[in-house]
């Protein structure tokens, strides 16, 4: 295709009065869920994954809502936020500056396995069974990312670069700070009591601990 129109607005840095440019890098938050879902659907197209299958078909460590141990969680339920997986306290507590220090697999297993660092039956799951109701779940998309890793035997960031970013010529897109030129990154700000509060420069990529800019991917 051909780009018909492109324009940037606003400031990349307020202190330096630096305008936003067409090549300025930005944190995209939950928009990254689009890439996770695309990776899942690619695997479905290849016949490597069944959307209606129990996710434990593909995971090395099983995940079940302890209140409904006999009800499987499906891939489709993760995609549609109906899995009964809840963003517990560990979700917010695990935000950190910079690239992740533990793997996605290690974090997810710590969240869902009894005895794990982040395991909490009430915090991590809803009372209703999988498929019963819609409830937005960032952690659920983290599980989808782990499904991609388990099936392809590649880190999510590597799979998406090879099969999504590179084919689409998205050469300045990535999950990790180490994948991009941070000098081209807009300076992030918090919005607090009508004031723009600058985040620490070292927190350019305010990422969720397990290898994904996100679950607010």
Spans of model-derived segments:
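Active-site SXXK
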Residues: 1, 25-55, 141-149
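Short, conserved catalytic-motif segment at the N-terminal edge
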Residues: 1-26, 50, 118-125
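Short, surface-exposed loop or secondary-structure junction motifs
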Residues: 13, 67-217
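A broad detector of the eukaryotic-type serine/threonine protein kinase catalytic domain
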Residues: 25, 60-64, 126
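Generic hydrophobic/packing signal
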Residues: 39-44, 59, 79-86
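Short, glycine/proline-biased beta-turn/loop segments that scaffold the active-site neighborhood
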Residues: 51-66, 167-168
